[in-house]
A protein has these predicted regions:
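Intrinsically disordered, low-complexity Ser/Thr/Pro/Gly-rich regulatory segments
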Residues: 1-105, 109-222
Length: 222
């Protein structure tokens, strides 16, 4: 996929989910089909499976992450994260608000089988998040927000009784850029391209990256 192609393709699919073959060209269409990024609709049009997946492939092939991110909206990003978590057995709450000040996580995920929870914020729309200094500030705020959530957990049990089954929580920030990754202020910073791998191997990465583990004071062992 040529660099000029990737931006045009992202533009088309960010505007509508399905496009006519003539809008892409046969060579580009064939490549997208081979990469399993699109499928054929009822009338022969090509429909995108995931704009985020297309964005990740574009970045891997050399497209600028900052420019690529302009074709994504926060719903695309969070939907991809939520889908990956659901596939891994997590209960998912998007735009999870809590506390009198209405703090919010983009996604809160809990797995009652492993008794683990993950509080997630998605940072994809600004080049400033490629700065390690800025990301350090963001991670610190995220960690403090997670601590406040756990302090507030008793008030959340009425609406979310599953919290009783979660023993510990981790903080996670998902980015589109790969320039900053690892553990910052005890919070995992994971490029979206590696998100599925991180979730599937959570125990390994938590230990390897020294991600802070916060105990849930509302946990009740059954």
């Amino acid at each position: 996929m040529r660099l000029t192609d990737c931006y045009n393709i992202l533009r088309l699919f960010s505007e509508k989910p399905c496009v006519k073959l003539g809008e892409l060209g046969s060579d580009v269409a064939e490549e997208l089909i081979n990469l399993e990024l699109v499928y054929r609709g009822i009338s022969g049009e090509l429909c995108i499976r995931s704009v985020v997946q297309l964005a990740m492939v574009s970045i891997k092939q050399g497209c600028d992450p900052t420019k690529v991110s302009t074709y994504l909206n926060w719903r695309d990003f969070e939907a991809f994260v939520a889908e990956a978590l659901l596939e891994s057995g997590y209960e998912v709450f998007k735009n999870f608000r809590f506390g009198v000040k209405k703090w919010e996580f983009d996604v809160l995920a809990v797995n009652t089988t492993s008794s683990l929870g993950i509080a997630i914020d998605c940072k994809h729309w600004s080049p400033k998040y490629s700065s390690s200094g800025k990301m350090r500030d963001v991670a610190l705020v995220h960690l403090e927000k997670l601590k406040k959530f756990l302090d507030w957990c008793n008030y959340e049990l009425l609406d979310h009784p599953l919290l009783r089954k979660i023993k510990k929580f981790y903080g996670l920030i998902v980015t589109i850029s790969e320039s900053v990754r690892g553990s910052i202020q005890g919070v995992a910073v994971v490029p979206i391209y590696y998100f599925r791998d991180f979730i599937e191997n959570l125990g390994y990465y938590v230990e390897e990256l020294k991600v802070v583990t916060l105990k849930n004071p509302c946990y009740i062992q059954e």
